[in-house]
Amino acid sequence: MNWIGKLIGMMLGFILAGPIGLIIGLFIGHVVFDQGRFRQWFQTTASARSQPSKIQEVFFNTTFRVMGFVAKADGRVSENEIRQARQVMQQMNLDDSMKREAIRLFTEGKQPNFNLDESLNELRQACVFQPALLRVFLEIQIQMASADGQGLSGQKRQVLQTICRRLEVFGFDYNQFEQRFRAEQNYQRYQQRATQDPRAYLNDAYKVLGLTSAATDSEIKKSYRRLMSQHHPDKLMAKGLPPEMMKMATQKTQQIKKAYEQIRKVRSMV
């Protein structure tokens, strides 16, 4: 029965694009269906979707492996990058056993023979129905890439862009992602200062919501609700976010809420 995929592909290809489509459909039907790649992909993703614990395991393992890879992207791992890895472990409130495992995974990612594509492919398949988790993963990686405090080097940015392409997050724009991250960093520093002027760092507050000051009140409310829904800790955990990362998700929603409240206060929004 290994000819069914070819037949279906040929029929669809001919209907959509005539004789040329027939040839293309023959090839796609053979490679994707008859050779079992589609079946294998479906079985893998369906299995991951039905096992949240599997998603949590893959997410945790890939997060620390790729953090190690990103840290070593420019040839060496700095003290600031090691400190960032430890900070993530602290935020996750890992016990001694899990810390040792996280360190092992981080070290594994630094090795020259680390297979980035294989690791990302496993994560992508596990989270194929959970793009919100992939966004959390990317946020952790850009934090690592920026740990030196000197901005993103060309090598680190190239690695991040490669990771984004491999994960194939629908509707994801890397440049917007990096811009929002920078705004969040600036806004966090603003929050740690004593000034109470709500107009300070207002542009960064807009960027935290993925907007500009030209946005309408309606657009601001819509973006706020969307981001709060995307990053809600309980929702993320239900989708497969490891329980240890709940604190990080909570901090994210708190920052989104503070940015929204600052904008609302300046605009006198109801």
From Swiss-Prot:
Protein location: Cell inner membrane
InterPro entries from the UniProt entry: DjlA, DjlA_DnaK_co-chaperone, DjlA_N, DnaJ_domain, J_dom_sf, TerB-like
Transmembrane segments: 7-30
Side of membrane Cytoplasmic, spans: 31-270
CDD domains found in the cross-reference section: DnaJ, terB_like_DjlA
SMART domains per record: DnaJ
GO molecular function list: protein-folding chaperone binding
Entry GO terms, CC: plasma membrane
Alphabetized Gene3D superfamilies for the sequence: DnaJ domain, TerB-like
Record topological domains on the Periplasmic side: 1-6
Keywords per UniProt: Cell inner membrane, Cell membrane, Chaperone, Membrane, Transmembrane, Transmembrane helix
Disulfide bonds: none
Membrane topology recorded in Swiss-Prot or TrEMBL: Single-pass type III membrane protein
J domain boundaries: 204-270
Summary of subunit composition and partner proteins: Homodimer.
Stated role: Regulatory DnaK co-chaperone. Direct interaction between DnaK and DjlA is needed for the induction of the wcaABCDE operon, involved in the synthesis of a colanic acid polysaccharide capsule, possibly through activation of the RcsB/RcsC phosphotransfer signaling pathway. The colanic acid capsule may help the bacterium survive conditions outside the host.
HAMAP family assigned: DjlA (MF_01153)
Domain notes: The transmembrane domain is a dimerization domain.
Protein name as it appears in the record: Co-chaperone protein DjlA
Organism: Coxiella burnetii (strain RSA 493 / Nine Mile phase I)
